[in-house]
Amino acid sequence: MGLESYHSDHDRYPYGTEAPFNNHGVAVANGEEYSSNVVYMALFGDHKNEGVPSRDTTIYNDELNPSTQPKSNPTVREVHVKSKDGRPVTLYILADPWGSPYRYRLGSEQSIPTRTDRARNLKMGNGLNPDYDFWSFGKDGDSDLKDPHAPENEDDIGNLPKF
């Protein structure tokens, strides 16, 4: 599995703001709409969101190559969004079979490695699981991120092992 291999090599799961990732702060591992971009960048090695792996990078999942995706039902979709400062940004996200973005969130036991003693091992993850949450809103495309037992979550597909 790509995320486990990434974790083995880096001693952490990807969180989206670390170098060399360049998504202009639009996508981080918080479960929001474009959060699967973090998984795409980490596993395919496309650190600049150009649709190709960065030079001299490890590709953990070559099935995420946008140029080889089936046109009828691609796993990787190109989306155009605005950065925090209003500039247009292209992102590649992972899409479920219904065309909606997968969601990715760091787990409750995950932390951001930092260089300062004051902020060392700052907890970032707020997932339901200790490592990470990776899920689809399901066929209805709706979910309640705050209440895992909400009725709209009944068709959600959680912690997918695919990536």
Predicted feature residues:
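N-terminal pilin/flagellin-like segments and related low-complexity appendage regions
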Residues: 1-163
